[in-house]
Amino acid sequence: MGLLREGINEVIATTCRNAAPMGIIYRNGVARMVVFRGSHTAERIREHGWVVANFLYDPVVYVKTAFEDLPPEDFIDEQVGEIAVQRLSGVEAWAAYQAEIDQETNEALIVTLTLLKETICSLALHPVNRGFNSIIDATVHATRFQQSRDPHLHGLIRHHASLIRKCGGARELEALELLSTYLDFGDEE
């Protein structure tokens, strides 16, 4: 699997007309996802049996897809063998997977992914940017904070916001501003 690296790979996962940030766990040559029950992603994996990993480096898209639906024009139809899938426009690469539910818990589905096709659309070098990485972490914490209102998660979000302000560029700062609107934190440090 050329596009995935060992560990957790943060992507925007698309299912049928749905997009959400997702971590693909890649260990010992096996790709898996943990998908929370009740999510659109879980429902569509159960119904259709596929998922597309979209590789892009736009922090605003990660924040937006965590909290809202994208318009239909943001999706591109692709035919992968006998399966019609949707990916996002403007991605640098994408990979379509068969998604098989291996295990179910009260909270999540454990899904094994089998690569069907991967495509590199453009090659771009992305130096490590702590601001971008912190947007990913803050967004993960924010989705959990919305459910639990855990003060510890609020503290983590504030910590990452500080790093974004220090290390991020204009697009990371825009993503942080958008994230703040979803959480109603205002401009607090």
Model-predicted segments: where are they?
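N-terminal structural module
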Residues: 1-54, 60
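C-terminal non-catalytic accessory extensions
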Residues: 173-189
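Eukaryotic intrinsically disordered, low-complexity regulatory regions
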Residues: 137-177
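A residue-level detector for short acidic-glycine micro-motifs
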Residues: 24-26, 55, 99-103, 117
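Flexible glycine-rich active-site/ligand-binding loops centered on an Asp-His dyad
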Residues: 102-154
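Short, conserved beta-strand edge motifs with alternating hydrophobic and charged residues
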Residues: 52-57, 95-96, 112
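Short coil-to-beta-strand transition motifs
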Residues: 87-95
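Short, structured beta-strand-loop surface elements
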Residues: 38-86
